[in-house]
Amino acid sequence: MLILISPAKTLDYQSPLTTTRYTLPELLDNAQQLIHEARKLTPPQISSLMRISDKLAGINAARFHDWQPNFTPENARQAILAFKGDVYTGLQAETFSEDDFDFAQQHLRMISGLYGVLRPLDLMQPYRLEMGIRLENARGKDLYQFWGDIITNKLNEALAAQGDNVVINLASDEYFKSVKPKKLNAEIIKPVFLDEKNGKFKIISFYAKKARGLMSRFIIENRLTKPEQLTGFNSEGYFFDEASSSNGELVFKRYEQR
């Protein structure tokens, strides 16, 4: 079973590390090509392209400039400990045991605009390059054209290595769009998280993102290997709703706190 999650815009390169083990990203040659393209952008162009403030654009221009192909624990950090958005608040990888990291390294993948596919312990230098950004490059007009089948092929390698054919899609639509489902050698299962608001159940972005992290943690902590085991997920008040679910979609609901 292979879990897919999105990266985060918020990064943490200050907190103490809970493991010293690391691996290197497998698609660094591709990342280097994107850095070459990104370095051509001025801060105002970055601001416009990413729809971010001038201050953030300056920070990210500096990150592109400072990026170097030789990754060490001094200039990079394990991806699962560097990302700090809503998904990672639910995941809480900073509390993982070494055995948890082992299982995650085999069963969890982060899709990345810059790095393509990251394993949890892959070192990562700081960046911001969302998959949906229209960064023109030698392979096309955006990052989807740049990555082509590369991400899908890398996921197929991971599935083959574990002798499995199930993908748990906990990534956002923006990131999963970089995967080619017809070329993926797997059954795709998508957990959906609905929260009650004013008597109606719907997707509330902040809660749904955190729930994707909670589900990832649930799978890792309990060493789950079969999709039917996901129905036992009950973190922070969520419960499985079989009536609303289908073969490819597992629906989890949570009542409004009153």
Swiss-Prot record:
Residue stretches spanning the membrane: none
GO biological process annotation, one example: response to hydroperoxide
GO CC terms, sorted: cytosol
HAMAP family given in the database record: UPF0246 (MF_00652)
Family under the similarity heading: Belongs to the UPF0246 family.
NCBIfam families from the UniProt entry: PRK02101.1-1, PRK02101.1-3
Stated name of the protein: UPF0246 protein YaaA
Originating organism: Escherichia coli (strain UTI89 / UPEC)
